[in-house]
Curated annotation (Swiss-Prot):
One GO term of the biological process aspect: negative regulation of DNA-templated transcription
Function recorded in the entry: Negative regulator of class I heat shock genes (grpE-dnaK-dnaJ and groELS operons). Prevents heat-shock induction of these operons.
Protein name: Heat-inducible transcription repressor HrcA
Domain of life: Bacteria
Similarity comment: family membership: Belongs to the HrcA family.
Pfam families: HrcA, HrcA_DNA-bdg
GO molecular function: DNA binding
HAMAP family (alphabetical): HrcA
Assigned keywords, A-Z: Repressor, Stress response, Transcription, Transcription regulation
Length: 347
């Protein structure tokens, strides 16, 4: 446990280092902390904090800098949160409005990057347990059918079905009507379980087409995707750009996305804002970074995650409320009756 004096000095050191990026010396800490304490006493406290792994001494400086563990203590116990400034709040409110979910994800990602000057990341709202609002079939040619799936979020998804026989327009309409009447609004997992029991009693052409449609829909909605914006802004962050090998690994991760998707899916289960500082992410490309995330919801169900990837030396006091408010506004916009109303027609 840190005593009050050690906490005050650690808080002062982290805030100063975030502000200017320079190692903080004992004399500066004495002046800024407001404590009635000598530089020698400050040095003793700094030595204790260093032994605890909360601060470190760069070889080229007599001052100290916070470690990832030091940032964690700062964020969990010492951070003073303030309301987001009005200009940034207005920018978030004007940038997030009811739209197709995919366009909204792209807008949120860009907005997060613009406001923080780091990389904005958003998982698009596609879930394996997703439902559909409406299904249509369109005959393209013999044995080739276009499945048009409208999700509850308003996205229109097109999937090509290659069938074992030709279907008449009447058969396609009959199958679509059956699915829409019996299963609209139900999860694909629930539909799959029901179909296993019902297929035997259905006409063969309906059963085969329904099976193909649900399989294609599940395959598509189980594939989460991630939108990354502004990653090139990290090139101007000295702590990251000074190590080219680490920077290359970071950009490889942005390009291939699998590891980042896994991390964001973990944070989807959290309540409110989550932070992964340095090695806490378990991903070596992020060892010098902090990832700040928050889940967003549709009708009370968490359907995606958004956040910011930046250096560990970031203005947590500002970034955390930006991520939190953006997630809340995306959730609100997704639940708006206007959401998805201008999704492009598939016909």
């Amino acid at each position: 446990m840190l005593n009050d004096r050690a906490q005050r000095l650690l808080k002062t050191l982290v805030e100063r280092y975030i502000a200017d990026g320079q190692p903080v010396g004992s004399r500066t800490l004495t002046q800024l902390s407001g404590l009635d304490i000598s530089p020698a006493s400050v040095r003793n406290v700094m030595a204790e904090l260093e032994d605890m792994g909360l601060v470190a001494s760069p070889h080229t400086s007599a001052g100290r800098v916070p470690t990832a563990r030091g940032y964690r203590v700062f964020v969990d116990k010492l951070l003073t949160m303030h309301p987001l400034e009005q200009q940034a709040l207005r920018q978030v409110e004007s940038g997030i409005h009811p739209d197709s979910p995919l366009r909204m994800a792209a807008a949120a990602s860009q907005l997060l990057s613009d406001l923080t000057h780091f990389a904005g990341v958003v998982i698009t709202p596609q879930r394996a347990d997703a439902a559909f609002r409406q299904i249509e079939f369109l005959r393209l040619s013999e044995k080739r059918i276009l499945l048009i799936l409208v999700t509850p979020l308003g996205d229109v998804q097109n999937h090509l079905l290659v069938t074992d026989r030709d279907y008449t327009p009447g058969e396609l309409i009959e199958t679509a009507n059956y699915l829409n009447h019996h299963y609209a609004g139900q999860s694909l997992e629930h539909i799959t379980r029901d179909l296993e029991q019902e297929l035997a009693s259905l006409q063969g052409h309906i059963a085969r087409l329904m099976t193909a449609a649900i399989h294609a829909s599940k395959e598509a909605t189980s594939q989460d995707d991630i939108v990354v914006s502004g990653e090139k802004r990290l090139l101007s962050v000295e702590e990251l750009s000074s190590d080219l090998a680490s920077l290359r690994r970071l950009f490889d991760m942005f390009e291939h996305k699998t590891e980042l998707l896994h991390l964001l899916n973990i944070s989807r289960q959290a309540q409110g804002v989550s932070l992964f500082i340095g090695e806490e992410s378990g991903l070596s490309p992020l060892d010098g970074c902090t990832v700040v995330t928050a889940p967003y919801t549709f009708d009370g169900t968490r359907v995606g995650t958004l956040g910011v990837v930046g250096p560990t030396r970031m203005n947590y006091e500002r970034v955390i409320p930006i991520v939190d408010i953006t997630a809340r506004l995306v959730s609100s916009a997704l639940s708006s009756p206007l959401s998805g109303s201008d999704a492009p027609s598939s016909h």
